[in-house]
Regions:
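The feature captures the beta-strand-to-loop junction immediately N-terminal to the Walker
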Residues: 27-29
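Helix-to-loop junction immediately C-terminal to a conserved catalytic motif
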Residues: 42
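Conserved ABC transporter NBD signature motif
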Residues: 50-63
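ABC-family P-loop ATPase nucleotide-binding domains
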Residues: 72-127
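Catalytic Walker B motif of ABC-type/P-loop ATPase nucleotide-binding domains
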Residues: 140-144, 149
Length: 198
């Protein structure tokens, strides 16, 4: 459970296990608690009650090494060139494949010498997703990866997710665009008013 100050619970008595090798949809309206759950898993928030375990351990150094996280707002430095972002990720994450990232960027005809802020919003989101999916993680957490892009870009993003993750890994995709991703999901979690209803 997670409570902010003395207000109502943002998440209440949530009890779930995410299994290996599944693509899981985390669905629910805006404000339902999806991002709070994601932040708890990523150790960006601390539960008010209960615990979060990742690979049998509390979130920390170990989980940072096995979780690849795409937040709903970009955290990347817009002044950096794409090729420098790729190098940065390669230096920072041992499981990052520079070859995979470069190949996907070429497929999209993204100029790797361009600065991130000069790209369209859709291409910036694709770059962020490519960086996340180029890791060989055990758990991928994607917060609204298709929220701000056109339908063609959504198709590419879903294809990228499906073709570039470790099949033994788990992917948790948070979205309110249910119809766009339901055909790729193995399991659906629906959160409403901070509680799991499905």
């Amino acid at each position: 459970s997670k409570k902010y100050n003395k207000s109502a619970y943002a998440l209440h008595n949530l009890n779930l296990t995410l299994n290996h090798g599944q693509i899981i949809g985390l669905l629910g309206p805006n404000g339902s608690g999806k991002t709070t759950l994601i932040k708890l898993i990523n150790d960006l928030l601390t539960p008010t009650e209960g615990t979060v375990l990742i690979d049998g351990e509390l979130p920390g150094v170990h989980s940072k090494n096995i979780v690849s996280y795409l937040p709903d707002h970009s955290y990347l430095d817009g002044s950096m060139k794409i090729q420098d972002l790729v190098s940065y990720f390669a230096d920072f994450y041992e499981d990052f494949s520079e070859i995979r990232a470069t190949s996907m960027l070429k497929d999209l005809n993204i100029d790797q010498t361009a600065r991130l802020k000069t790209l369209s919003k859709g291409n910036q989101e694709k770059v962020a997703l490519i960086l996340v999916m180029s890791r060989d993680a055990k758990l991928y957490i994607l917060d609204e990866p298709i929220g701000g892009v056109d339908p063609a870009a959504r198709d590419y993003i879903l294809h990228t997710i499906l073709s570039n993750y470790n099949e033994h890994a788990t992917i948790l995709i948070s979205t309110h665009l249910i119809s766009d991703i339901e055909n790729i999901l193995d399991r659906v979690l629906f959160i409403q008013n901070g509680e799991l209803v499905l």
